[in-house]
Every structure is written in structure tokens, then in C-alpha cells.
Regions:
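Conserved ABC ATPase signature
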Residues: 63-67, 71
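Short, glycine/charged-rich "phosphate-handling" switch motifs in NTP-dependent
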Residues: 136, 148
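A short, surface-exposed alpha-helical micro-motif characterized by mixed small hydrophobic
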Residues: 130-132
Length: 184
């Protein structure tokens, strides 16, 4: 099961061991799960997924502290995808990044999804990110799933009161829309 389902963590700073090189960080799942026969095969898979995640070969020799937040998140994504999972949980995977880097990581995730045929469960509190990346949305309230629908349908016509309140709280650039947030 671990090979087929993987996780991208929220904080790329905390998710990477400062004592390991990027090569070793990405290779670790292959070695722990016994998915390669030797170092050459491991290195080939590491180089392949690093390139797909827009990491240069020179990056593989460095340590995590040498990278920006976006680069660290790409390293985390490479580590997640190196064992070729079918299902990936992205737990607030862009929340710690600034907006321009968020867009870059979201575009990378979408291209990897298309290229590798992945299914993502994208956990986020940022509804603009959810609207951009998700095909289907589920809303939780107090630990309970209260609504689930295709993204456009949920955003255009929410049925649960919490979903309505959540969507009404999204800031608007239209001055006529101010003050319309619903209270629970």
C-alpha cells in the first residue's frame, strides 16, 4: 500500500532531513521499499524523477538548506513520486509558499498528474487554489464531510449552509459585494 499511496507534506523545511543530500532524500523510499536492485538503478530513477520535478542534476549533490521553499517543495514532490504511486495526498502542499511559487508548484502538480496518471487528494483551506486545481471538492465541517460535488457545481451552487458561509467569506474586488459574508 505504501508504494501506491504517498504524501506531500505542507512544510518543505521540516519534511527534509538536513543531514541528507537531495539524492539520498529522493532515493530513500526506493531503498526502504526495496524497489531497486542496485545503486545504478536507484540513481537512474532519482535522476529521472528529479528532471520531471524540474530539478537539475547538480541539485542532487546539495543539502536542503541550500534551496528556496519552492525548490524544497519540488524535492519533496520528487521523493513522493519516485516510487511511482497511483494516489497522492497533498496536505496543504502550497500553503507555506508565496503566491508566485504556489502557482509554479500547482502547475507542476497538474503536469505531473497528466504525465503520470496520478490521482491527487488536495487538502487546502485556500479556496482559490481549490478552484484552480481540483475536479471535485469535498467540504468538511467540525471533522464531518458535509458536501461533495464537482468543483464548478459546488462553487456555483453550494447546498450546505457551511459551504455557503465559507464561499461567501471569500474576499471580493467588487465594492458592491462587501459585507455579504454569512455567519454560522
Amino acid at each position: 500500500y505504501r508504494k501506491l499511496a504517498q504524501l506531500i507534506f505542507q512544510d518543505p523545511y521540516a519534511a527534509l532531513s538536513p543531514r541528507m543530500t537531495v539524492r539520498d532524500i529522493i532515493a530513500e523510499p526506493l531503498e526502504v521499499m526495496g524497489l531497486t536492485q542496485n545503486r545504478e538503478e536507484t540513481d537512474e530513477k532519482v535522476r529521472e524523477i528529479a528532471a520531471k520535478c524540474r530539478l537539475n542534476l547538480e541539485h542532487l549533490r546539495r543539502f536542503p538548506h541550500a534551496f528556496s521553499g519552492g525548490q524544497r517543495q519540488r524535492i519533496s514532490i520528487a521523493r513522493t513520486l519516485v516510487c511511482n504511486p497511483n494516489f497522492v495526498v497533498a496536505d496543504e502542499s502550497v500553503a507555506a509558499l508565496d503566491v508566485s511559487i504556489q502557482a509554479d508548484i500547482l502547475n507542476l502538480l497538474q503536469s505531473l498528474q497528466d504525465e503520470l496518471g496520478l490521482t491527487f487528494m488536495f487538502i487546502s483551506h485556500d479556496l482559490s487554489v481549490v478552484a484552480h486545481i481540483c475536479d471535485h471538492v469535498a467540504v468538511m465541517y467540525l471533522g464531518t464531510l458535509v458536501e461533495s460535488a464537482p468543483t464548478r457545481k459546488l462553487f456555483d451552487n453550494p447546498s450546505h449552509p457551511y459551504t455557503k458561509a465559507l464561499l461567501s467569506a471569500i474576499p471580493s474586488l467588487d465594492p458592491d459585494d462587501s459585507g455579504k459574508a454569512q455567519k454560522l
